[in-house]
Swiss-Prot record:
Transmembrane residue ranges: none
Location (main, coarse): mitochondrion
Record's function text: May only reduce GSH-thiol disulfides, but not protein disulfides. Participates probably to the maturation of iron-sulfur proteins and to the regulation of the redox state of the BOLA proteins.
CC terms in the record's Gene Ontology section: cytosol; mitochondrion
One matching Pfam family: Glutaredoxin
Keyword Transit peptide included in the entry's annotation: yes
Protein known as: Monothiol glutaredoxin-S15, mitochondrial
Amino acid sequence: MAASLSSRLIKGIANLKAVRSSRLTSASVYQNGMMRFSSTVPSDSDTHDDFKPTQKVPPDSTDSLKDIVENDVKDNPVMIYMKGVPESPQCGFSSLAVRVLQQYNVPISSRNILEDQELKNAVKSFSHWPTFPQIFIKGEFIGGSDIILNMHKEGELEQKLKDVSGNQD
C-alpha cells in the first residue's frame, strides 16, 4: 500500500512542470523521467534576508544602471549578462554560451541578472534585446547563445576573439 501511494505521488510530482503564484516561483527540469534540477525562489516579504536575491549595486550609487552596463561593455573585452555565473550557469542557454566562449581561452566577465531585476531591465534597454544571455565582445553586442554557437561553427567567433588578451589560440 505504501509503495503504491509513494509511486503515485512521485508520478504526480513528476508531471508538474512549473508553479507560479504571487509568493513562489518554482521550476523543475526532467530528463528521461528523472528530476535533474529543481529551484524555488521565494518572493514574499516573509522570506528571510539570507534567501532573498542580493543587489550588487548599492541603491545610493552615483552611477546609473545604464552607466554600469556601458562601463561593463566598454571595460571588458568579453562581457556576458547571464542567468548564474560562468562557473555555475542557471539555464541551458547561459551554459551553452559560456562553454562556447571557454573554447577560446579568453577572460569572460559576467553579471548574474537573476540577482537584480533592475539591472536585467537596464541590459535589455541598452541592447534592445529581450532574452538572455547577452554577449558583448569588444564593446559590440553580439547576441545570445544561438548566435555565438553559429559564429563558432562558421569560424567568425575565432576572428572576433583573435586579439582578445588571454586567447592562446
